[in-house]
C-alpha cells in the first residue's frame, strides 16, 4: 500500500490535492445555490430571458430546462464533495467530465472570438466614426464589465443560465467593445483580455489536475485496502477448557465410535 500510494503525489503546486478538491467542491456547491437563487429572483421579477418567448410552452420549457440544468450542476458539485469526504473515487467522475466540457467550451469561445475579430473590427470602425470621443465614466463601465466577464469565466460553469439562450452564444460578447476607444487602446485591451482569458484556461487545467490526482490517489488507496483486507486470515477465538470439555464428541460417519478413555 505504501509504495503505490507514494508513487502518486499528494500535492499539486504546493497544495494538498484533498484540501484543494474539497475547497473546490464547497465553492461550486455555493455557486450552484447562488445561481439557483439568482435565477429564481429573475424569473419572479420577469427579468429572465424567457420573457421574450411569446409562446407559452416555449416559456415553460426554457424555465424548466434552466432550473433542471442548475439542479444537475448542484448534484454534480455535491457528488464531488461527498466523494472527497467519504473517499469514494467514483463520485468524482461527473465533475471531471464537467471540467473537460467546460475547458473545451472556453477554448472554442476564445478561438471563435479571434476568428470573428476581423469582421468585428471592420464593423466597429465604421460605427465609431459617428460616435464622439469617450469620457471617463464610459471607460469605467467598460472596465467593470470586463472584470465581471473575467470573474464569470473563473467559475467552472461560465454563465450557467445562458447555455440555453441562443442569443448569448455570440462569441463577440466576450470581447471588450470598441465604442469610444482609439485603435491603440482597443489593441491594448485585447492584449489584456487575451492574457486574462489564457490565465483562466490555465486555472481550469490546474483545477482538473487537482481533481484528477485526488481521484487517482483515492482509487489507489481503496484498491490497496481491498487487497490487504482479502489477504488477512480470519481469526477464530479458541474455546476455554470448560467449553471444550462440554462440547459433544464428534463421531465419524460410517465408522465405529472411539473407545472410552480409561486410566491405566
From Swiss-Prot:
InterPro entries: LAPTM4/5, LAPTM_4A/5, LAPTM_transporter. It is a multi-pass membrane protein. It holds the Pfam family Mtp. Its main location: membrane. Keywords: Lysosome, Membrane, Phosphoprotein, Transmembrane, Transmembrane helix, Transport. GO terms for cellular component: lysosomal membrane. The modification Phosphotyrosine is found at residue 261. The chain crosses the membrane at residues 19-39, 64-84, 92-112, 136-156, 186-206. It is found in: Lysosome membrane. It comes from the Eukaryota. Belongs to the LAPTM4/LAPTM5 transporter family. May have a special functional role during embryogenesis and in adult hematopoietic cells. Binds to ubiquitin. This is Lysosomal-associated transmembrane protein 5. The gene is LAPTM5.
Amino acid at each position: 500500500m505504501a509504495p503505490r500510494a507514494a508513487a502518486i503525489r499528494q500535492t499539486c503546486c504546493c497544495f494538498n490535492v484533498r484540501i484543494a478538491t474539497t475547497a473546490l467542491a464547497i465553492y461550486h456547491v455555493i455557486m450552484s445555490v447562488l445561481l439557483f437563487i439568482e435565477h429564481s429572483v429573475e424569473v419572479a421579477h420577469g427579468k429572465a430571458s424567457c420573457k421574450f418567448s411569446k409562446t407559452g410552452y416555449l416559456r415553460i420549457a426554457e424555465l424548466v430546462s434552466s432550473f433542471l440544468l442548475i439542479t444537475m450542476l448542484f448534484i454534480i458539485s455535491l457528488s464531488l464533495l461527498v466523494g472527497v469526504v467519504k473517499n469514494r473515487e467514483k463520485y468524482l467522475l461527473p465533475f471531471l467530465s464537467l471540467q473537460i466540457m467546460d475547458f473545451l467550451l472556453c477554448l472554442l469561445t476564445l478561438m471563435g472570438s479571434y476568428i470573428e475579430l476581423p469582421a468585428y473590427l471592420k464593423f466597429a470602425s465604421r460605427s465609431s466614426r459617428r460616435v464622439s470621443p469617450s469620457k471617463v465614466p464610459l471607460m469605467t463601465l467598460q472596465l467593470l464589465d470586463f472584470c465581471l466577464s473575467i470573474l464569470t469565466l473563473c467559475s467552472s460553469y461560465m454563465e450557467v443560465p445562458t447555455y440555453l439562450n441562443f442569443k448569448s452564444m455570440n462569441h463577440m460578447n466576450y470581447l471588450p467593445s470598441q465604442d469610444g476607444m482609439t485603435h491603440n487602446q482597443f489593441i491594448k485591451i485585447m492584449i489584456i483580455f487575451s492574457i486574462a482569458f489564457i490565465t483562466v484556461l490555465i486555472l481550469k487545467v490546474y483545477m482538473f489536475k487537482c481533481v484528477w490526482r485526488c481521484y487517482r490517489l483515492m482509487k489507489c488507496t481503496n484498491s490497496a485496502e481491498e487487497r490487504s483486507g482479502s489477504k488477512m486470515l480470519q481469526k477464530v477465538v479458541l474455546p476455554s477448557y470448560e467449553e471444550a470439555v462440554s462440547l459433544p464428541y464428534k463421531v465419524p460417519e460410517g465408522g465405529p465410535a472411539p473407545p472410552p478413555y480409561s486410566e491405566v
